[in-house]
Amino acid sequence: MRLFIAALIAESVREALREACAQLQRAAPDRTLRWVAPENYHITLLFLGEQDETRIPAIIQAMESAQRGIPPFEIAVQGLGVFPNWNRPSVLWAGVSEDGAFLSHIARALERTLLPAPSGKPFRPHITLARCKMPCRDTEGLKKRLYSAAQQLAPANFGQYKLQATSLMQSTLTPDGAVYTVLHTVAL
């Protein structure tokens, strides 16, 4: 099973992001961008990859432990950016800010507990909106159109909501894209 742990998105934020992506798609209608389906928007806390089903109880226990003592908290979704940078865009994302760095705390605790060798990379909470298929055709033209459209939306505030839980998700890859299924939810 292909698994990850995520913070799911409020419907009002999902709708605002869907509208922003529709604007971006009109401004940069390029087939080298693979847009994430709005129902799949989420904040990844930890990608686990292929896991045996027998590990699920230990994963749930790690989620409960990582979240112990953390109350529900506000998350704001605002602004757009790319990874790794505008010279080589591979992922278009919406920014996430939070009260108290709770997402970072949970993500680091999960990584320490569930990964054999933690990555050491800083946790950068975000919502992936699109990925660039490699190799990108017309990279310069795409970058200019995407950058211009994203800059118009960059200061946008897509909303905020109170995160009440995290979810263990299964990702099933299909020719039409990934299908995500909630396997278990752990309340804050």
Segments (PLM) and residue ranges:
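Histidine-dependent nucleotide/RNA phosphoesterase domain, centered on the 2H-phosphoesterase fold
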Residues: 1-188
